Curated annotation (Swiss-Prot):
Function: E3 ubiquitin ligase that plays an important role in regulating cardiac development and contractility, muscle growth, metabolism, and fiber-type differentiation. Acts as a critical factor that regulates cardiomyocyte size during development in concert with TRIM63 by regulating E2F1-mediated gene expression. Plays a role in apoptosis induction in cardiomyocytes by promoting ubiquitination of the DUSP1 phosphatase. Promotes non-canonical NF-kappa-B signaling and B-cell-mediated immune responses by mediating NFKB2 'Lys-48'-linked ubiquitination and processing.
Coiled coil residues, start to end: 168-248
Catalytic activity entry: S-ubiquitinyl-[E2 ubiquitin-conjugating enzyme]-L-cysteine + [acceptor protein]-L-lysine = [E2 ubiquitin-conjugating enzyme]-L-cysteine + N(6)-ubiquitinyl-[acceptor protein]-L-lysine
Subunit structure as annotated in this protein's UniProt entry: Homooligomer and heterooligomer. Interacts with titin/TTN. Interacts with myosins. Interacts with SQSTM1 and NBR1. Isoform 4 may not able to interact with isoform 1, isoform 2 and isoform 3. Probably interacts with TRIM63 and TRIM54.
A Pfam family recorded for this sequence: zf-RING_UBOX
Keyword Disulfide bond among UniProt keywords: no
EC number assigned by the record: 2.3.2.27
Protein name: Tripartite motif-containing protein 55
C-alpha cells in the first residue's frame, strides 16, 4: 500500500512540475523565460530580449545601435492578447521587471537539477522493518513473512512475489494485446461505418435528385397541359367576343342608318309644299319600309356567355397524386414473374395456333401464283371449278368429270405429257352452256358442240418437259394409273355433288393447279418416304381444244 502511495505522490509531483513549466514558457521564443522578465500592461510576461525584438520588428524605421533601438517612444502589440503596448522614452527598458516570475524560475531550476531519490524497497505496514517478499493468494495483497507466520495471513495461502509478478505481468500484457487488437477491429468497424454513412448520404442525394427530376417532369407536363387548356379557353373567348362584337357593329350601323332616316323624315315633314312632299315621300317611305323589313334581330342564346363546359374535375388526378409513394423491388419482381408465366402459357397456345395456320397456308398456296398474271387468272378459274358447290348450277347434272392424279407417287425421272399429246383422244359430248355451271367458262358458240376431250394422266412434280421421256414400257403403267384415277374421280364427284354445303375454301386445300402447256413443272423436293404427300391435280387441257 505504501508503495502505491509513494508512486501516486511521485506522479502528482511530476505532473505539478510539468504544469509549472508550461506556465514559464515565453510566447516568443517558446522556451523558459530568461532574465530579466518584463511584465506588460496587459499582465503578460516576456523576456526583455524578446520584447526588444518584437518592438524592433514593429518599428523597422527607427535607428538602432548594436541591436537596440536608440529613438525614444514607440508601440507594439502583445503576442498573447494583441493588446497595444505604448512605450515611453526609455523604450523596453521602461517596462517593469516581474521579480516573482524570476524567483519561480530559480526554484524550478533547482528542483529539476536535484537528483532523483532512489525508490526504496517497500516495507510492511504492520512490521515496518520487514520487507514485502510474499503474496497472499486469498487476500490478493503483497505482505511479509512475519504476517504469514504470526500475523493476519497465517491461515492464508501464499506464493513467492516473483511468481505472482511474472504471472500478472503476462496477464496484463495479454490483456493489453487483446485491447489493442480489439481497438484495431473497432477502428476497422468505425471506418466501415463511416464509409457506410458516406454511401448513405450519396445514395440519398442521388435519390433526392432523381425524385426532384421526376417531379419537375410532372410539373412540366402539368404546366404544358395548363397552357394547352388555357389556349383552348382563350380561343373560345376570342371566337365568342368576335361574334358579339360583330353583332354590336351590325346593330350600331343599323341604328346609325335608321337615325339618319328618322332625321331625314323629320326634316321632310317640315316641307310646306305639298307637291314637293309628294314627289319625295314615296322614295323615303320605301327606304323606311326596307329598313324595317330587312333588319332582323339576332338574339344570343341563353347561357352563351357561360364557360361552364370548361370546368375541370381533378378529383381522380388528385387521388392518384396523393397515392404516389415509393415502390418496393420485391413486389415488382413478383409481378414480373407472374407476367412471364402468363406470357409463356399464351406463347405455347399461340405457337400451336400459328403452326396450324402455317400448315393451312402452305396447303392452300399455289406455286408461282405471283409470277405471271395470266397464269394467276387461269389458276383462279381452276379454283372456282374445283369447288362446284360455290357456284350456282342451273341443272342437276355435274360438270364433266376430270381425272385427278393418282394417289400413288410417280418414280423420279418419269415425265408425263400434258395437253393434246397425252393419251388416246375420245369424242365426248360437251354439254350446253345452259346445262353446265357458270356461262363465263363456256362461251355462247360452245352450246351443243362436240369436241374431242382428252384425258390427262397425272402430272408429277418431277416433269420438266413435254413428251414421254421415261423408261420404255411406262405407257401401260400410265394407262392403268389413269383408269384407276378416273374411277376415283367419279366417286369423288358423286360425293361432292351430295355435299353442297361445304365451303369453297375446303375444296381448295390439298389441290394444286397443273402446269400450263409448254411450261415445265417445279422439280420434286424429295422421293420415297421423304417426298411431299400426293396431291389431287385437276387438268383442264380440254379447254385447249376450243382454239381449234
Amino acid at each position: 500500500m505504501s508503495a502505491s502511495l509513494n508512486y501516486k505522490s511521485f506522479s502528482k509531483e511530476q505532473q505539478t512540475m510539468d504544469n509549472l513549466e508550461k506556465q514559464l514558457i515565453c510566447p516568443i521564443c517558446l522556451e523558459m523565460f530568461t532574465k530579466p522578465v518584463v511584465i506588460l500592461p496587459c499582465q503578460h510576461n516576456l523576456c526583455r530580449k524578446c520584447a526588444s525584438d518584437i518592438f524592433q520588428a514593429s518599428n523597422p524605421y527607427l535607428p538602432t545601435r548594436g541591436g537596440t533601438t536608440m529613438a525614444s517612444g514607440g508601440r507594439f502589440r502583445c503576442p498573447s492578447c494583441r493588446h497595444e503596448v505604448v512605450l515611453d522614452r526609455h523604450g523596453v527598458y521602461g517596462l517593469q521587471r516581474n521579480l516573482l516570475v524570476e524567483n519561480i524560475i530559480d526554484i524550478y531550476k533547482q528542483e529539476s537539477t536535484r537528483p532523483e531519490k532512489k525508490s526504496d524497497q517497500p516495507m510492511c505496514e504492520e512490521h515496518e522493518e520487514e520487507r514485502i517478499n510474499i503474496y497472499c493468494l486469498n487476500c490478493e495483497v503483497p505482505t511479509c513473512s512475519l504476517c504469514k507466520v504470526f500475523g493476519a495471513h497465517k491461515d492464508c495461502q501464499v506464493a513467492p512475489l516473483t511468481h505472482v509478478f511474472q504471472r500478472q505481468k503476462s496477464e496484463l500484457s495479454d490483456g493489453i494485446a487483446i485491447l489493442v487488437g480489439s481497438n484495431d477491429r473497432v477502428q476497422g468497424v468505425i471506418s466501415q461505418l463511416e464509409d457506410t454513412c458516406k454511401t448513405i448520404e450519396e445514395c440519398c442525394r442521388k435519390q433526392k435528385q432523381e425524385l426532384c427530376e421526376k417531379f419537375d417532369y410532372l410539373y412540366g407536363i402539368l404546366e404544358e397541359r395548363k397552357n394547352e387548356m388555357t389556349q383552348v379557353i382563350t380561343r373560345t373567348q376570342e371566337e365568342k367576343l368576335e361574334h358579339v362584337r360583330a353583332l354590336i357593329k351590325k346593330y350600331s350601323d343599323h341604328l346609325e342608318n335608321v337615325s339618319k332616316l328618322v332625321e331625314s323624315g323629320i326634316q321632310f315633314m317640315d316641307e310646306p309644299e305639298m307637291a314637293v312632299f309628294l314627289q319625295n315621300a314615296k322614295t323615303l317611305l320605301k327606304k323606311i319600309s326596307e329598313a324595317s323589313k330587312a333588319f332582323q334581330m339576332e338574339k344570343i342564346e341563353h347561357g352563351y356567355e357561360n364557360m361552364n363546359h370548361f370546368t375541370v374535375n381533378l378529383n381522380r388526378e388528385e387521388k392518384i397524386i396523393r397515392e404516389i409513394d415509393f415502390y418496393r423491388e420485391d413486389e415488382d419482381e413478383e409481378e414480373e414473374e407472374g407476367g412471364e408465366g402468363e406470357k409463356e402459357g399464351e406463347g405455347e397456345v399461340g405457337g400451336e395456333a400459328v403452326e396450324v395456320e402455317e400448315v393451312e397456308n402452305v396447303q392452300t398456296e399455289f406455286p408461282g401464283e405471283d409470277e405471271n398474271p395470266e397464269k394467276a387468272s387461269e389458276l383462279s378459274q381452276v379454283e372456282l371449278q374445283a369447288a362446284p358447290g360455290a357456284l350456282p348450277v342451273s341443272s342437276p347434272e355435274p360438270p364433266p368429270a376430270l381425272p385427278p392424279a393418282a394417289d400413288a407417287p410417280v418414280t423420279q425421272g418419269e415425265v408425263v405429257p400434258t395437253g393434246s399429246e397425252q393419251t388416246t383422244e375420245s369424242e365426248t359430248p360437251v354439254p350446253a352452256a345452259a346445262e353446265t355451271a357458270d356461262p363465263l367458262f363456256y362461251p355462247s358458240w360452245y352450246k351443243g358442240q362436240t369436241r374431242k376431250a382428252t384425258t390427262n394422266p397425272p402430272c408429277t412434280p418431277g416433269s420438266e418437259g413435254l413428251g414421254q421421256i421415261g423408261p420404255p414400257g411406262s405407257e401401260d403403267s400410265n394407262v392403268r394409273k389413269a383408269e384407276v384415277a378416273a374411277a376415283a374421280a367419279s366417286e369423288r364427284a358423286a360425293v361432292s355433288g351430295k355435299e353442297t354445303s361445304a365451303p369453297a375454301a375446303t375444296s381448295q386445300i390439298g389441290f394444286e393447279a397443273p402446269p400450263l402447256q409448254g411450261q415445265a413443272a417445279a422439280p420434286a423436293s424429295g422421293s420415297g418416304a421423304d417426298s411431299e404427300p400426293a396431291r389431287h391435280i385437276f387438268s383442264f387441257s380440254w379447254l385447249n381444244s376450243l382454239n381449234e
